[in-house]
Amino acid sequence: MAGHTYGATTTAAEIVAHVRLQRRRVVVTGASSGIGVETARALASTGAEVTLAVRNLEAGRQVANEIADELPPGPGELQVARLDLADPASVAEFVRAWSGPLHILDNNAGVMALPRLTRTPAGYEMQFATNHLGHFALSTGLHRWLAAANGARVVSVASIGHLFSPVVFDDLHYRFRPYDQWTSYGQSKSANVLFAVGGAQRWADDGVTVNALMPGNVATTALARHLGADDLANFGQETDLALPPVKTIEQGAATSVLLAVSPDVEGVTGRYYEDCVEAPVVDERAGHTGGVAPYVLDQENADRLWQISEALIR
């Protein structure tokens, strides 16, 4: 990267240290806990207008107040808006309420490894519906405002978990196969990367870049709230993956913030990053602590998922 050397221990604050985004508008989903809070904090420190898109308005307002108290007086502004990604009506209302250019959309919210098969009222498996379909509906719904920004960036927070499973197009919602919390999570994270690949190709002429990332192994995030001690202890045995070294929340938010604001990735699109650099392609998952699978970079898979997703959110 030109001018900077970033890595696994880089923090979000280091990424934005010399970045100024006055009069830029930002949306961060899931910004009431974990990495989402730190992402919002870092982006707000640049002077941007940051909207915290959250399920729990009270929690979101508390976070916004805490961030505002930490920042020096300046042009930055924090807003809080309700968004439940598993509820199509909530997503549609958020989209309807938005007006004007959107410069950065950080699709950060998610659920992880739900222990039991749960479906939305429409019959969609909950991890796929929340992690992918909700963000897909949000992003496509806001597309005209992203295009209006003349150089917008969309950031899709994925995971090493995409190595657990590709998108199983013939049974997205576990109607014909036994439910597994890890393959379900993996499928949704694979979809997050394929969204970036598909969006990059479709939105290039609008000046919109779309990239995906692995934030890292952040033990203090609320993402793993559904997991018990045994689930975490058996992680490697059940998934054939080795956990990467633990990061702080500040380090975990860094790659997302890099893709959102860094001049070093200007024009980069359709890529998958980890530890603030583009991830290497890996063909086998066993023993890996990182890397990206070929099936999530495949344009045909991305196109197929895009078409299916459009049909599912109608």
Explain the meaning of each model-derived region.
Residues 2-231, 311-312:
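Rossmann-fold NAD(P)H-dependent dehydrogenase/reductase core
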Residues 2-6, 188, 235-290, 297-303:
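C-terminal helical subdomain
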Residues 69, 76, 287-295:
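Charged/polar, low-hydrophobicity segments characteristic of intrinsically disordered regions
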